[in-house]
């Protein structure tokens, strides 16, 4: 039975978003967060540490380690990319920024492939709008282009994308290769070599980026969907053979990437079933709601309005393909320890599904989205500006007191460049809002302009006005500086209990030679860094006959990241006896005031 297509779009509604505006939005979203910041705790910093170990030659390229510790995520490609960038960068480029450059391109690649993937899904004959009796419906190419604009806007609007998409971690690499695979499968009916290469590259990249099990499920399921795709009623024998060959090729690429993952020891089935407790499920529900907002309600509406095309004897690729990728990621989110980073991979497919809701939205629903977005992001921008003013002037007093409580000892600094960029972004937001509430012919993508623009505005304001505060609270830089100040002659330093982010920070920003502590005390390092107990006391595992506590060094914003510094007895006896001291977060500022 043939059911009516729910998409009714005129040619006027299929006009495309101006290219300059779309590119400006993408650059405004992508660049902040990669520029002008330190590596943040702890996954971002730990990944940088593994890359630095590869550059120094102290780790195997096939099995990256950090002072002998393996990676938490069974990945190699993200660390290779960062290490190669650090090796190729000129000396005047800082190593941590050089490591971010390939990840900036990965984010851009995810944006481009999400746009093209949505475009080719919209070119599907079953996705095209209903033809009018006297003409005037949207042309296929124009309709697909407008839908792709909406898909990219939905992708950028997702709240969970911002931070994880600007880290040098395997999560961003997995996102990019998922989007590449999504594009390859979406474009496969319309192109030959390009989409096939993209699908193979996506599967291979996913496997080498720590997600080989997802690559297996993506590849097998998508190959079955492609084999059973009957977008048109006329399919000759040659077309059937071509579709079968392409499906077999996808399966072969899946097997090759799986074999490579097994050979490198990257395939680890780590399934953690959720416990039957409301607290756990409540956390998952909250994550799904805020992380994928505002795409998830639109995606649900798509599944409802296009349900006859989804549950039909004829495979509707434009709904079935993103729905399959979304289903795999949603299940993996429930069965993995890093739920947010797994859910990140669902965003390209989720954005495509959200785009197909746009031709079916009523005007009242579109207006509701606009007003909610306007109030939410305008309120966020106002709050960011008020807190920044409080950091600079102390007025209003309550936000200034909150900053002092959360980041003791933080001293605000003023940057004309950051202020100018933030001001221009805020003015641009006002202009976009004025344009959106004005009277003009509505294109199908207009409902997502404010969500995407608001997400970009909030992220850009965070990365300009609040960057000094975020660096102070989210990095290990100050902790490393205070630790180095306590070392008379920073030779090698033994460690016990430190997180991988801390280890990487002490090695990368502190130039310390860290080694794991020898249980029998046979090491020759004069210093020892230890993770303190929850009450900041010394752990019982430290041999007081070998080590003498020298200082407790507090992280400026998180006491859980503090460290205890010990001196070996043989080195301590040669110095004057001193009582252990606590290095407070505002110690430097207090001494300056005195």
What role is predicted for each listed range?
Residues 2-16, 20-23, 168, 187-594:
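Membrane-embedded architecture of ER/inner-membrane glycosylation machinery
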Residues 27-29, 33-61, 273-276:
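Aromatic-rich transmembrane-lumenal/periplasmic boundary elements in polytopic membrane proteins
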Residues 47-73, 77-80, 84-87:
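Extracytosolic helix-loop segments that constitute the early lumenal/periplasmic catalytic or substrate-binding loops
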Residues 76, 80, 89-117, 141-152, ...:
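Loop-to-helix entry region of an early transmembrane alpha helix in multi-pass inner-membrane enzymes
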Residues 160, 174-190, 350-353:
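Specific aromatic-rich, kink-prone transmembrane helix
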Residues 114-117, 161, 181, 299, ...:
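Hydrophobic/aromatic residues in alpha-helical transmembrane segments
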Residues 160-173, 212-214:
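Short acidic/glycine- and proline-prone juxtamembrane loop motifs at membrane-interface regions
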Residues 101-139, 156-157, 180:
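Transmembrane-helix motifs of polytopic, lipid-linked glycan transferases
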């Amino acid at each position: 039975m043939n059911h009516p297509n729910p998409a009714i779009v005129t040619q006027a509604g299929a006009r495309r978003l101006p290219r300059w505006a779309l590119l400006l939005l993408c650059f405004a979203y992508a660049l902040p967060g990669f520029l002008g910041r330190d590596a943040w705790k702890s996954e971002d910093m730990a990944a940088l540490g593994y890359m630095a170990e590869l550059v120094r030659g102290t780790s195997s390229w096939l099995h990256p380690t950090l002072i002998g510790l393996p990676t938490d995520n069974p990945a190699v490609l993200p660390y290779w990319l960062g290490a190669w960038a650090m090796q190729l960068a000129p000396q005047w480029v800082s190593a941590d920024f050089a490591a971010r450059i390939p990840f900036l391109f990965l984010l851009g690649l995810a944006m481009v492939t999400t746009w093209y993937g949505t475009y080719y899904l919209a070119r599907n004959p079953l996705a095209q709008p209903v033809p009018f009796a006297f003409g005037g419906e949207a042309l296929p190419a124009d309709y697909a282009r407008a839908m792709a604009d909406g898909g990219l806007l939905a992708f950028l609007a997702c709240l969970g994308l911002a931070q994880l998409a600007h880290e040098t971690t395997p999560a961003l690499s997995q996102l990019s290769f998922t989007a590449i695979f999504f594009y390859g499968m979406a474009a496969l009916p319309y192109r030959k070599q390009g989409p096939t290469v993209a699908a193979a590259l996506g599967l291979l990249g996913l496997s080498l980026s720590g997600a080989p099990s997802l690559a297996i499920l993506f590849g097998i399921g998508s190959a079955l969907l492609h084999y059973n795709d009957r977008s048109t009623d006329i399919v000759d024998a040659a077309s059937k053979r071509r579709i079968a060959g392409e499906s077999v090729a996808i399966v072969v690429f899946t097997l090759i990437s799986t074999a490579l993952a097994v050979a490198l020891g990257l395939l680890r089935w780590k399934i953690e079933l959720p416990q039957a407790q409301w607290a756990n499920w409540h956390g998952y529900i909250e994550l799904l709601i805020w992380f994928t907002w505002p795409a998830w309600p639109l995606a649900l509406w798509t599944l409802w309005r296009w349900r006859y095309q989804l549950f039909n004897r004829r495979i509707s690729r434009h709904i079935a393909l993103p729905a399959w990728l979304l289903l795999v990621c949603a299940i993996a989110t429930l069965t993995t320890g890093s739920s947010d980073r797994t859910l990140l991979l669902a965003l390209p497919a989720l954005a495509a599904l959200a785009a197909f809701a746009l031709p079916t939205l009523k005007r009242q629903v579109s207006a509701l989205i606009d007003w909610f977005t306007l109030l939410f992001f305008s309120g966020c921008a106002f709050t960011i500006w008020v807190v920044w003013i409080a950091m600079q002037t102390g007025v209003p007093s309550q936000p200034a007191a909150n900053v002092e409580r959360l980041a003791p000892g933080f001293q605000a600094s003023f940057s004309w460049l950051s202020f100018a960029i933030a001001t221009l972004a805020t003015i641009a937001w006002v202009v976009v809002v004025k344009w959106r509430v004005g009277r003009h012919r509505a294109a199908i993508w207009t409902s997502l302009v404010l969500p995407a623009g608001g997400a970009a505005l909030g992220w850009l304001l965070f990365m300009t006005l609040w960057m000094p505060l975020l660096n102070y609270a989210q990095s290990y830089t100050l902790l490393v500086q205070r630790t180095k100040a306590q070392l008379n002659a920073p030779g090698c330093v033994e460690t016990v209990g430190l997180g991988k982010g801390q280890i990487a920070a002490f090695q990368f920003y502190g130039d310390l030679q860290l080694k794991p502590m020898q249980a029998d005390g046979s090491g020759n390092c004069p210093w020892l860094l230890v993770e303190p107990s929850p009450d900041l006391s010394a752990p019982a595992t430290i041999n007081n006959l070998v080590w003498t506590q020298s200082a407790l060094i507090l992280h400026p914003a998180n006491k859980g990241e503090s460290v205890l510094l010990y001196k070996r007895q043989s080195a301590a006896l040669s110095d004057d006896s001193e009582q252990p001291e606590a290095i407070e977060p505002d110690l430097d500022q207090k001494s300056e005031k005195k």
